[in-house]
Amino acid sequence: MDRMTEDALRLNLLKRSLDPADERDDVLAKRLKMEGHEAMERLKMLALLKRKDLANLEVPHELPTKQDGSGVKGYEEKLNGNLRPHGDNNRTAGRPGKENINDEPVDMSARRSEPDRGRLTPSPDIIVLSDNEASSPRSSSRMEERLKAANLEMFKGKGMEERQQLIKQLRDELRLEEARLVLLKKLRQSQLQKENVVQKTPVVQNAASIVQPSPAHVGQQGLSKLPSRPGAQGIEPQNMRTLQGHSVIRSATNTTLPHMLMSQRVIAPNPAQLQGQRGPPKPGIVRTTTPNMNPAISYQPQSSSSVPCQRTTSSAIYMNLASHIQPGTVNRVSSPLPSPSAMSDAANSQAAAKLALRKQLEKTLLEIPPPKPPAPLLHFLPSAANSEFIYMVGLEEVVQSVIDSQGKNCASLLRVEPFVCAQCRTDFTPHWKQEKNGKILCEQCMTSNQKKALKAEHTNRLKNAFVKALQQEQEIEQRLQQQAALSPTTAPAVSSVSKQETIMRHHTLRQAPQPQSSLQRGIPTSARSMLSNFAQAPQLSVPGGLLGMPGVNIAYLNTGIGGHKAPSLADRQREYLLDMIPPRSISQSISGQK
C-alpha cells in the first residue's frame, strides 16, 4: 500500500507539472469541493460508529424493558455528528419510513454494507491521495516559477545595454543591503561588548584586591613562626604575620602556653604593661618566647628594614633578662638608650608607610586598563571583514574587467604594478594596508603589528607604575635610616661588676639546668645565629625606667670586658641560650597548631 501511495504521489506531481495554469485553478476549486464532501462523509461515519458502540453497550441491558414498552432509550442522529439521548416521553409520533416507536432506532442512512463501511472508513496509517489534491512541494515549485516569470518579464523588450545597466543597479542595491547587514551586526556586537564590560568590572576588582604582598612588605612580617626544621634559614611569606597585633603568639596556642606569654610583645610595650612582668623568675617564659624571636634574627632582608626589627627584638630579650636580675646586685650606670616607645613608633610608621604605598600601587594597577583587543572578524557571508567573501568580490571584479576589456581597446587600459608586502614580501592578501610613511603591508602583518603595539603600551604602563612605587619605597627607607642614625644606640660608660655579683647573676640565669648533650641536639640554626649576634653585639644597657632602677648594665654580653673572663663569659652565653630553648613538647604543640 505504501508503495502504491508513493507511486501515486509521483504520478500526481508529474501531472501537475504538465497542467496549464487555468486548469490548475479549476483543479484547485474541484479539490476544495471534494475535500469538503469527504469531510462531511467522514463526520457522518464517525457519528454512526459512535452510535453503534453506545447501542452495543446499553441495548442488551434494556431488551426486556423494550418488550414492555417502558424506559426505552434511543439516539437521534444529526447531520453534524452530535448525538442526543431521549426517552419515550420525548418521542413524537412515529414518522413513516424512519423509525418505529415499539422497535429500537434504525438509521436509514446507513445503507452501505459492513465491508463497504470498513473499506471507506479512513485508517490512521493510510493516507489517501486523489489525483486533484495538491501537496507542499507543488506550492514551493509554483513560487519559484512565479519568480522566474517575474525576472523574465523584467528583461522583456530591453536591449543588451539596458539589461547590463539594470543588472549593475541591482548589484549595487545588493551590496548596499550587505553593507547595512554588516553595520547592524557590528552595532549589535558593540552593545554586547559594553554589557560584558559592565558585568565583568566588579569581578575584576574583587580578584585584583587579592594581591600577594611585596617583598618589602614581607620584611615587616618577620616575627611569626617557629622554623619547622633546624636547617631553615628563612621564613616563607605565607607563614608570616603583620605587626598590627604586636603579639608573637597566635590565639590558637592560648590553651597550651602560660598566661604570662600573652603579655610578651615583639615591639617594646609601655611601662604600664611592664609592671606586671616584674616578679619571681619563671624559666618557662624565656624558653617559650625564644622560638618566636629566633626567626626574626635569622631572617635578614636586603633592605634596611631589618635594623629596627633586630633592635626591637634585642630590647625584648633584654626585658626578659631584666626580670631575672635582682635590683641590688648591680651598680648604677648612667647610660641612657633610646626609649622603646620611640623604636615602636619608628617601626609602626615604617609599616604604615609601606602598607599605604602597597595600597596605592594596587589602586594604580587597577586603574591601568587592559590592552584593548582589535575588532573581531565577522565570519559570516556576506561580510566585508571575511576573507573568503573578499576573495569572491575580487574574483568578480577581475571577471568584470576582463569582460569590459574584450569589448574595448586594449591599449587604453592602464597597467598597475602588483603590490608586495614590505614586511613579509607576499603579493597576495584580501586587503592591502598603507601606513603613514608609505609602506604597504598585508592584512596579517598589519594585524600582528597592532597587537604588538597594544601589548607594548600596556607593559610600559605597568612598568612605570612599579618603578614609581619602588622609588617611593626607597625614599621611605632612606628617611627612616636617617632618623635611626640620629638616635644614640650605644652607651660608653661601663661600671665595674664584682665577682660575687657575677656569680649570683650566673646562678639566677641557670635556674633550670638541663644536660647540654640533649639540648645541643635540638638547637635550631636560628639559635646559633642569635648566639653569634650576641657575641658581636655592642655593649648595651637597659634603661632604668623599665626596671624601676636608675640604670642596669648587662656586662656579660660583651666579650671585651675583662680579658681573663672571656672563656667564662662565652660559657655563660651558651648556657643562657640553651636555657632559652623550649622543651620538645611545647615546641611540638606550637608547630602542630600552626
UniProtKB/Swiss-Prot annotation:
Transmembrane region(s): none
Protein's name according to its UniProt entry: Transcriptional repressor p66-beta
GO BP terms: chromatin remodeling; negative regulation of DNA-templated transcription; negative regulation of transcription by RNA polymerase II; positive regulation of DNA-templated transcription; regulation of cell fate specification; regulation of stem cell differentiation
Gene name tied to this protein: Gatad2b
Segments for region (CR1): 166-191
The organism of origin for this protein: Mus musculus (Mouse)
Domain comment quoted from the record: Both CR1 and CR2 regions are required for speckled nuclear localization.
Gene Ontology molecular functions: sequence-specific DNA binding; zinc ion binding
PROSITE patterns per UniProt: GATA_ZN_FINGER_2
